[in-house]
């Protein structure tokens, strides 16, 4: 389109008598207006060109974005294909491993272990079970009990044996010290007729016996008393005064490396009782150290430091020792928890007294003055009379109170009570099924009569 047509169609040209008007194709046009018109025309043309360029660039931008989406889809497809290829190759690797080493060689942690509950055997002390965090000593793990002399190490181990026997398990006591007192074990509730005892000649023999028992998968608890008494064969066959540096530590390290895999499969509680020694020349820090090297410290899932902290008197006579058990290592719950309990010279750990004290502290048992009551049931006056009542007259009530404490404090119950409750739940569920069946039969009969 020419400028003449644009001007004639767009603007009304007025003739003016001044000198600014010029003649353009027979028309007088103001020169200033013409310049502005030309400028506007060029500006509009530039804007049109810019708009065309922008539209082209936007189209190309849309096209590039579409290309990017296609590229992202291709990347995701390639990732999916790579993932499927890696998963198929992983399945092939798993099949090869299972074919070479057996099923379960390589497993996913979440699918196999996250839902499994830790099986435990109660320690005989309610406070210690709470301090352990899982309700007792774990199965398939190594537990070390150490402390000074006459602090209750063997007594605690015998209580664990008594609890395991109540659940129907087999137990073995490796008496390397040759100092087991059967009468004291019987007072603690150990069934001597069902307890296996071994008194080995040397440390190698004792650990070989432990290995054989673990491989048999027939034991619930094995106690080795003690690590300090596991004398290596070379030391027994040598002369008095011969130096055998590190022989016992090497023996324990080798034995624990061998016992650990079989211990997990046996589902047994392996307890090592250990003594303490004093380091020479220690100026700062704790000079105490356990015998047998450091291997037992690393392989143990639970380490309990038990020490005598006081005595319990009745008149002028000392009737019990007060001990403090500290969980210095715990792989299953927070460590460094403590428990203080009494070891009676006649009956061992005073578990019923612990339950009464804890139940009063948690509000399960009400105490008004010197009288104790549970669920509006008046028990007795005084702690000792209440203890006697629960032990001799109301043992079922004692178990009920203990279970409430476990549910509230450690969310775990002893293996004995779990089995009893499972049997009771099976019976009650059967009864409910029978009642439901009767209701279904009655409904069927009603429907048939209605049809008739």
UniProtKB/Swiss-Prot annotation:
Alphabetically sorted, this entry's keywords are: ATP-binding, DNA damage, DNA recombination, DNA-binding, Mitochondrion, Nucleotide-binding
Q: Which residues bind ATP?
A: 147-154
Any one GO BP annotation for this protein: DNA recombination
Fetch the CDD domains from UniProt. RecA
Q: Which family does it belong to?
A: Belongs to the RecA family.
- Acidic residues biased stretches: 420-452
Which residue ranges are recorded for the region named Disordered? 53-90, 412-452
The protein's name is Mitochondrial DNA repair protein recA homolog
Q: Which PROSITE patterns match?
A: RECA_1, RECA_2, RECA_3
Q: What does this protein do?
A: Involved in DNA recombination ability. Important for survival following exposure to DNA damaging agents.
Q: Which SUPFAM superfamilies match?
A: P-loop containing nucleoside triphosphate hydrolases, RecA protein, C-terminal domain
HAMAP family reported for this sequence? RecA
Its cellular-component GO annotations read:
mitochondrion
Instruction: List, in alphabetical order, the Gene Ontology terms for molecular function in this entry.
Output: ATP binding; ATP hydrolysis activity; ATP-dependent DNA damage sensor activity; single-stranded DNA binding
* Record keyword Plastid present: no
Q: Name one Pfam family in it.
A: RecA
Q: Where in the cell is it found?
A: Mitochondrion
Q: Which organism is it from?
A: Dictyostelium discoideum (Social amoeba)
């Amino acid at each position: 389109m020419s400028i003449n047509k644009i001007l004639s169609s767009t603007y009304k040209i007025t003739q003016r008598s001044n000198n600014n008007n010029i003649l353009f194709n027979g028309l007088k046009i103001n020169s200033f207006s013409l310049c502005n018109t030309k400028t506007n025309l060029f500006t509009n043309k530039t804007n049109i060109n810019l708009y065309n360029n922008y539209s082209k660039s936007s189209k190309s931008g849309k096209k590039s974005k579409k290309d990017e989406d296609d590229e992202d889809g291709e990347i995701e497809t390639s990732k999916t294909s790579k993932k499927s290829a890696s998963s198929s190759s992983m399945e092939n690797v798993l099949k090869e491993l299972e074919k070479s080493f057996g099923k379960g060689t390589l497993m996913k942690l979440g699918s196999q272990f996250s839902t499994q509950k830790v099986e435990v055997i109660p320690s005989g002390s309610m406070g210690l079970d709470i301090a352990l965090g899982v309700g007792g000593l774990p199965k398939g793990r190594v537990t070390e009990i150490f402390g000074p002399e006459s602090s209750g190490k063997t007594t605690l181990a015998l209580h664990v044996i008594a609890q395991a026997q109540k659940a129907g398990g087999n137990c073995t006591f490796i008496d390397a010290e040759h100092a087991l007192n059967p009468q004291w074990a019987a007072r603690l509730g150990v069934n001597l007729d069902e307890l296996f005892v071994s008194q080995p000649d040397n440390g190698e023999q004792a650990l070989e016996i432990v290995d054989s028992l673990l491989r048999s998968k027939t034991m619930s608890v094995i106690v080795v008393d003690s690590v300090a008494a596991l004398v290596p064969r070379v030391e027994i066959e040598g002369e008095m005064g011969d130096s055998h540096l590190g022989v016992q530590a090497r023996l324990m390290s080798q034995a624990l490396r061998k016992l650990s895999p079989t211990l997990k499969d046996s589902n047994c509680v392996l307890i090592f009782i250990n003594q303490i020694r004093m380091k020479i020349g220690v100026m700062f820090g704790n000079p105490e150290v356990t015998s047998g090297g450091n291997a037992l410290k690393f392989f143990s899932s639970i380490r309990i430091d038990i020490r005598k902290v006081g005595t319990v008197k009745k008149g002028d006579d000392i009737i019990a020792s007060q001990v403090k058990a500290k969980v210095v290592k715990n792989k299953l719950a927070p460590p460094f928890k403590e428990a203080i309990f009494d070891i009676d010279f006649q009956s061992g750990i005073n578990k019923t007294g612990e339950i009464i004290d804890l139940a009063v502290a948690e509000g399960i048992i009400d105490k008004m003055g010197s009288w104790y009551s549970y669920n509006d049931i008046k028990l007795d006056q005084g702690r000792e009379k209440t203890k006697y009542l629960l032990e001799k007259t109301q043992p079922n009530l004692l178990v009920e109170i203990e279970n409430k404490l476990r549910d509230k404090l450690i969310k775990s119950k002893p293996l004995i009570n779990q089995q009893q409750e499972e049997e009771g739940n099976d019976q009650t569920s059967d009864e409910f099924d029978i009642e439901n069946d009767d209701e279904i039969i009655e409904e069927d009969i009603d429907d048939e009569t209605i049809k008739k």
